Regions:
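Short, acidic, metal-binding catalytic loop of nucleotide-sugar glycosyltransferases
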Residues: 84-87, 97, 105-117
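Juxtamembrane "helix exit" motif at the C-terminal ends of alpha-helical transmembrane segments
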Residues: 33, 39-50, 323-345
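Acidic donor-binding segment of Leloir-type glycosyltransferases
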Residues: 108-141
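Acidic donor-binding loop at a coil-to-helix junction in glycosyltransferase catalytic cores
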Residues: 247-253
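Catalytic donor-sugar/metal-binding loop of nucleotide-sugar-dependent glycosyltransferases
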Residues: 255-274
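Long helical/loop segments within the catalytic core of UDP-sugar-dependent glycosyltransferases
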Residues: 137-153, 157-161, 177-246, 286, ...
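Juxtamembrane C-terminal module of membrane proteins
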Residues: 1-34, 57-90, 116-124, 305, ...
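Short beta-strand-to-loop acidic/aromatic patch adjacent to the donor-nucleotide binding site
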Residues: 159-174
Length: 423
């Protein structure tokens, strides 16, 4: 088509297509690319979810398999050693900051045969029946907090006895009549309820898991130690010492003994059980668990490659164990998202079953009433979650300093009257 001036004019629809066509095509191309990319991302979500859930359940399964091996085979037939050393051969050292009334109750509970009694404190206090030593502010060493107090005592106190019995400020010695013959003697614990029922149930749950301690004397390296009730041959304590920065002094000491090529670790678990206080609040318990796992991870370098791997797997399984109850229901609500779904369901249910097993074993260890046992079993998902939250926090954001788990006044703690028998 031409105009009066002789110029050619394009049809209107042709002009419209030529002026907007390229931009429309570009827009459609970009939209198609975005949709394709979104589809690819969405397609990978089930794979990532499946891989994550399988990783968690396999970590838990490996940890449970090793625990089962320890309890069913290594600890099988273990007999608690009989005492061979009189209590007159023992020097007691209580570690505290400033909990005078709590320490006094613990000192009062000591057997009369133990006469060499010392309290290592951060603040001045008066304790009847024991000599109090205050760690000077000017004392410097690599160790911090409790470890610093232990190291000061090692350097400045004289011990003429065969054994040093280390106790926490709230450790109540209830049935001690002697010390078995070993370089390191681990006593068992029985936390008493203080303010919180949930933290108490979490302690019962934890002690159900810790029946594995019966296997520790057969291992090259005990997997952990409890410093609230541990007797160490004085000569060994003076040789190894406590001068190292750590948040788990007791476990680090035992691992250091095992790592010392000049020492053949002689470790045993005694029958005697000492009462302690369960953490008074959930927050205190979470902080406590966080220090345990962070300290364990930090000190793995003392272990051989095998035990380092075992410790890491167990710590990871503990930290991610809050997800275990969820694992059992994911396939039901989100079917088809997990590879090998039937195998996953079977394994996740088996893992959760062991969580119940630890609750039952804890009730048996404590000799608790039927009502408390039923309450713990019913509340096991919540209790195991609270028990592990601190481990998860300590693994993700390790604490950088040691914080003391505060104790409550003795009158707020359940009575310790009980009969102790073997488990």
């Amino acid at each position: 088509m031409t105009t009066g001036d002789g110029k050619r004019r394009e049809p209107a629809e042709s002009l419209g297509r030529s002026s907007t066509g390229p931009s429309q095509q570009h827009l459609m191309s970009r939209l198609a690319s975005v949709l394709t990319m979104e589809g690819q991302v969405l397609a990978t979500v089930p794979a990532i979810l499946s891989m994550t859930l399988w990783t968690i359940v396999l970590l838990s399964a490996c940890s449970i398999a090793y625990w089962t091996y320890l309890v069913a085979f290594v600890a099988r037939g273990y007999e608690y050693p009989e005492p061979e050393h009189d209590l007159a051969d023992v020097q007691v050292r209580f570690l505290t900051v400033e909990a005078e009334h709590i320490v006094q109750e613990s000192v009062n509970a000591l057997p009369e045969a133990i006469t060499d009694r010392h309290v290592i404190a951060e603040q001045p206090m008066e304790i009847g029946g024991a000599t109090v030593h205050v760690v000077p502010e000017a004392f410097e060493c690599a160790a911090i907090r409790k470890g610093r107090a232990l190291e000061w005592a090692r350097q400045n106190l004289t011990c003429e006895q065969e054994y040093l019995l280390f106790l926490d400020e709230d450790s109540i010695v209830t049935d001690l009549d002697g010390i078995p013959d070993a370089d390191v003697v681990q006593f068992r614990e029985r936390p008493r309820r203080s303010r919180s029922w949930l933290t108490y149930l979490a302690e019962v749950f934890r002690l159900g898991f810790q029946v594995e301690q019966r296997a520790f004397p057969s291992l090259t390296v005990p997997l952990y130690a409890w410093g609230g009730g541990i007797a160490i041959r004085a000569e060994l304590e003076d040789r190894i010492g406590w001068d190292r920065k750590t948040m788990i002094e007791d476990t680090t000491f035992v691992w250091s003994v095992a790592a010392d090529e000049g020492v053949d670790l002689d470790f045993t678990l005694a029958r005697a059980t000492f009462d302690t206080q369960a953490p008074p609040t959930i927050r205190a318990m979470i902080g406590q668990r966080g220090r345990w796992i962070a300290g364990s991870q930090a000190e793995r370098g003392l272990l051989s490659r095998l035990y380092r791997t075992l410790t890491t797997v167990r710590n990871l399984a503990w930290a991610f164990s809050p997800a275990v109850p969820v694992l059992t229901v994911v396939p039901l609500f989100v079917p088809g998202t997990i590879a090998f779904e039937l195998a996953f369901q079977v394994l996740s249910v088996a893992v959760f079953a062991f969580v119940i097993v630890w609750s039952v074993l804890g009730v048996r260890y404590y000799g608790e009433s039927l009502s408390v046992g039923v309450a713990l079993v019913v509340l096991t998902p919540i209790v195991s979650l609270l028990h592990s939250l601190g481990a998860f926090a300590g693994l993700v954001a390790p604490p950088t300093d040691f914080a003391v788990t505060r104790k409550v006044e003795p009158e707020l703690v359940e009575t310790a009257d009980r009969e102790v028998d073997g488990d």
